[in-house]
C-alpha cells in the first residue's frame, strides 16, 4: 500500500514586540520600517519590506520580502499576500529603499504597487501605503496620491 504524503504548513503566533504599536500615519510606518532596515546598507543595497496590521492598525508583524542589488529588487506579490493571510492582516504597508537617494518612484515602483493593490483588494486586505526610504528622507505613495 502506497501513501502520498502532503507537506503541512504550520503557523506559530506570538504577541510580542511591536504588537501594541499603532500605525496611524505614514510617519508612524516609516518609524517602524527604519527599525528594521539595515542603516549600514541603506545607501548600498535595495531591500523591500511589508508591514502587516490588524483592523485597529496595530502591528501584527513585519517581513523582509527581498534584498538585492543597487538599483532594484525582486518582489513576489504572492509572498506578500501569503504572509498577510497567515497572520490574518486587515491591512498592509510596503516600504523599500532607494540607495541612490532619489525619492521619486520609478515606473517599476508604480507598477508593482498597482499589482499588489489589485491582489490585496481581491483578498479584502487594504494596501494603506508604500513608502520609499533613503538615509535622509522618505516619500509616501498615499500622501502623494499614488494609491
Q: Can you name each region flagged by the protein language model?
A:
Residues 1-15, 31, 54-56, 71-147:
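Active-site-proximal loop/helix of nucleotide/amide-processing enzymes and allied scaffolds
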Amino acid at each position: 500500500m502506497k501513501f502520498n504524503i502532503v507537506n503541512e504548513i504550520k503557523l506559530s503566533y506570538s504577541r510580542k514586540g511591536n504588537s501594541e504599536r499603532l500605525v496611524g500615519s505614514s510617519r508612524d510606518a516609516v518609524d517602524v520600517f527604519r527599525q528594521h532596515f539595515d542603516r549600514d546598507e541603506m545607501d548600498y543595497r535595495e531591500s523591500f519590506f511589508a508591514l502587516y496590521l490588524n483592523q485597529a492598525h496595530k502591528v501584527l508583524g513585519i517581513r523582509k520580502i527581498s534584498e538585492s542589488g543597487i538599483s532594484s529588487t525582486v518582489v513576489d506579490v504572492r509572498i506578500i499576500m501569503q504572509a498577510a493571510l497567515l497572520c490574518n492582516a486587515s491591512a498592509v504597508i510596503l516600504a523599500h529603499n532607494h540607495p541612490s537617494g532619489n525619492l521619486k518612484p520609478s515606473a517599476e515602483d508604480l507598477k508593482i504597487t498597482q499589482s499588489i493593490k489589485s491582489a490585496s483588494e481581491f483578498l479584502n486586505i487594504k494596501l494603506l501605503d508604500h513608502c520609499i526610504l533613503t538615509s535622509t528622507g522618505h516619500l509616501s505613495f498615499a500622501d502623494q496620491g499614488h494609491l
